[in-house]
Amino acid sequence: MHKVAKILNTLAGHRVVLVSHGVGETLSCRHGHFQDATVSEDEEVLVLHGAYYTLFAARHEVEIHPDELSIVFSRFNAFGDPIANAFVFCPGEDQTSPRDILREASVALAEAR
C-alpha cells in the first residue's frame, strides 16, 4: 500500500483518471489534481488529500471539491497487487458511511441524466 502511495505522490498536481464502482453503476471520475497520498494506520485505505474531480453523467458534469478522497483496496490481482474497487468520497468532516456516499453519488448521476 505504501508503494502505491509513493507512486501516486509522483502524480500529485497532474491530471489523472480513476474509475470507481458505485451502487448499481460505474462512476467515472476525472481528477484535476490532488495534493498528496497517504495510507491509513490499518493500511487498508489510501487517501488523496486536496482532491478535485468531476463526475460524468451522460452529457452532464458535476464538479466536486472535497477535502479528501479515500480509496479502499478490497481485492488483489494475480500478482498480489491491490486493485481498487471502491472509491469513497469523503468531504471534510462528513461522518456519512462510504455506502451512503456512493449511493448519493449514484442517485445524483441518475437524476442528472
Question: Residue spans of the language-model regions?
Answer:
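Short beta-rich binding modules
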Residues: 1-8, 12-113
